[in-house]
C-alpha cells in the first residue's frame, strides 16, 4: 500500500489488525502527517504472538532550527531498557536538539503513561507480555510501533540450576513439581511444603502472565500448580538477580523466572547448559499462543513504541528509531560496561549516561541510524565529553 504527496499535509489512513480473539478486528485510525515522497506502509507480523503491528516509514528528515519540545522516555526498571534509554536520549539531545527526561517505573503504569501522552517513547514493549494493553493502545490510535528494540528474547517462569537436575535427573518438567519429592527440593520453611517460585515483579507484564490477568488465569493456575507452588514477588529486578546469584554461589536449589540474553544469564552459563528450562506445554497448545492460558512463553518480540502525538511534533525521529539495531552483542557489552562502572557514580542515571557515551564513542554501528548532519552534531558533542 503506497501514499504520495508533494509537501502537503494529507490524511494517512493506517489500518490496524488486532488478533485478540478468533476473529480479526479491523480499525481505521486517521492521523495527519507530513510526507515528502512516496513511502510504504509495512506490517510487522509475529506468527507466534498473533499481533499485527503497522510501521509507517518516513522520509529521513533533519529538524528545522528553532525551539523544540522536551521528549519524555519511559524509564522501565531494568538495565537493558535504561541503557537503551541513555543511548537514545544522548542522540536525541545532542543530535536532534531536544531536551529529554525519563519517568521511571514498571511496565504497566508506564505503558498507561505512554497511551495518555505523559510519555513519548518507550524503548522496550515486550510481547506477548503486554498483548492486551498493546492491542488496546494500537486500536485506539494512541501508540504506534516505530522500530525493533532488542533481538528476539527468551523468557521462562520455570528455570532451575543444572546442578539441581544433575542431582535429580528425572526432574525435567513442570508436571514433576506436583510430586512431593520434587517440590520439597524448592520448599522453604514458610512455604507449607510448596515449592517456592521467585517470579515476576508486580507491575511487570510477565506478572499477569504468571498469576493471571484480564485474558486468563495465568500459568500457575492453568498448569495445575496452585496447590504445589508458592509464588514469591522479589520486589525488584535487582532483588531477583541477587536471589538467583546467591543460590548459584551456594549451590542451593532455586526455582525462578528470568529472561535473556542478559549479562546475568551469560555469567551463570545459560548458553552452556548450566540453567535448565523445565518442560512446559508449547505455546501452540494455548489459545492465541498466549502463555497466560497455561503454556510456555513464545519468543518475545520487543518493540520501540511512540505516542502518536509525537508524529506531528518530531516526525524526523521515526526513521532514527526504525533504524535502531540493538543486537545481543551490543546489549551484553553495554550491560557489562555498566556493571563495571556503576559504583563509580553518584546515581544510576549518571552511570547509564556514562555507559551510553562509552558505547557511542567505541562503536560505529549507530552511525547508520541518523542522517549525516545529525551524526556530525553527535560527534562534536562526544569529542567534548
Name each model feature, range by range:
Residues 16-19:
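C-terminal motif of bacterial Sec signal peptides marking the signal peptidase cleavage site
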Residues 21-23:
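Bacterial signal peptide processing site
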Residues 54-73, 186-194, 367-370, 378-385:
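Immediate post-signal peptide segment of exported/extracytoplasmic ligand-binding proteins
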Residues 57, 66-80, 98-103, 194-198, ...:
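Short, well-ordered beta-strand elements
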Residues 68, 208-228, 238-251, 316, ...:
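An extracytoplasmic/periplasmic, membrane-proximal ligand-sensing/linker region
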Residues 113, 119-123, 197-283:
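Ligand-binding pocket segment of bilobal, Venus flytrap-like solute-binding proteins
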Residues 142-200:
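A conserved helix-loop-strand patch within extracytoplasmic ligand-binding domains
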Residues 155-167, 300-313, 336-338:
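A bilobed periplasmic-binding-protein/Venus flytrap-type ligand-binding module shared by bacterial periplasmic
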Amino acid at each position: 500500500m503506497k501514499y504520495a504527496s508533494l509537501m502537503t499535509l494529507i490524511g494517512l489512513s493506517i489500518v490496524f489488525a488486532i488478533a485478540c480473539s478468533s476473529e480479526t478486528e479491523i480499525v481505521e485510525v486517521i492521523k495527519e502527517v507530513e510526507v515528502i515522497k512516496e513511502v510504504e506502509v509495512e506490517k510487522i507480523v509475529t506468527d507466534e504472538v498473533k499481533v499485527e503491528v503497522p510501521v509507517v516509514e518516513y522520509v529521513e528528515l533533519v529538524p528545522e532550527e528553532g525551539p523544540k519540545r522536551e521528549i519524555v522516555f519511559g524509564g522501565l526498571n531494568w538495565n537493558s531498557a535504561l541503557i537503551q534509554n541513555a543511548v537514545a536520549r544522548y542522540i536525541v539531545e545532542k543530535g536532534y536538539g531536544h531536551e529529554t527526561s525519563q519517568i521511571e517505573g514498571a511496565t504497566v503504569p508506564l505503558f498507561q503513561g505512554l497511551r495518555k501522552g505523559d510519555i513519548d517513547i518507550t524503548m522496550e514493549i515486550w510481547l506477548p507480555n503486554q498483548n492486551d494493553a498493546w492491542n488496546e493502545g494500537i486500536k485506539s490510535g494512541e501508540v504506534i510501533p516505530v522500530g525493533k528494540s532488542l533481538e528476539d528474547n527468551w523468557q521462562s517462569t520455570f528455570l532451575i540450576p543444572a546442578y539441581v537436575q544433575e542431582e535429580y535427573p528425572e526432574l525435567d518438567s513442570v508436571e514433576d513439581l506436583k510430586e512431593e519429592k520434587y517440590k520439597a527440593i524448592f520448599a522453604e520453611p514458610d512455604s507449607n511444603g510448596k515449592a517456592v517460585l521467585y517470579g515476576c515483579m508486580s507491575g511487570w507484564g510477565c506478572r499477569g502472565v504468571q498469576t493471571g490477568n484480564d485474558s486468563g488465569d495465568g500459568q500457575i493456575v492453568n498448569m495445575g500448580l496452585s496447590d504445589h507452588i508458592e509464588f514469591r514477588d522479589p520486589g525488584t529486578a535487582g532483588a531477583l538477580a541477587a536471589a538467583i546469584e546467591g543460590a548459584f554461589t551456594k549451590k542451593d536449589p532455586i526455582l525462578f523466572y528470568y529472561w535473556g540474553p542478559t549479562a546475568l544469564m551469560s555469567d551463570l552459563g545459560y548458553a552452556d547448559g548450566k540453567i535448565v528450562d523445565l518442560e512446559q506445554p508449547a505455546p501452540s497448545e494455548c489459545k492465541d499462543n498466549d502463555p497466560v492460558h497455561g503454556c510456555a512463553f513464545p519468543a518475545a518480540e520487543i518493540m520501540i513504541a511512540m505516542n502518536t502525538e509525537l508524529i506531528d511534533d518530531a516526525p524526523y525521529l521515526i526513521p532514527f528509531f526504525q533504524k535502531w539495531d540493538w543486537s545481543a552483542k551490543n546489549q551484553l557489552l553495554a550491560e557489562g560496561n555498566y556493571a563495571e562502572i556503576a559504583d563509580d557514580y553518584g546515581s544510576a542515571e549518571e552511570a547509564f549516561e556514562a555507559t551510553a557515551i562509552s558505547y557511542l564513542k567505541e562503536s560505529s554501528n549507530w552511525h547508520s541510524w541518523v542522517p549525516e548532519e545529525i551524526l556530525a552534531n553527535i560527534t562534536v558533542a562526544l569529542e567534548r565529553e
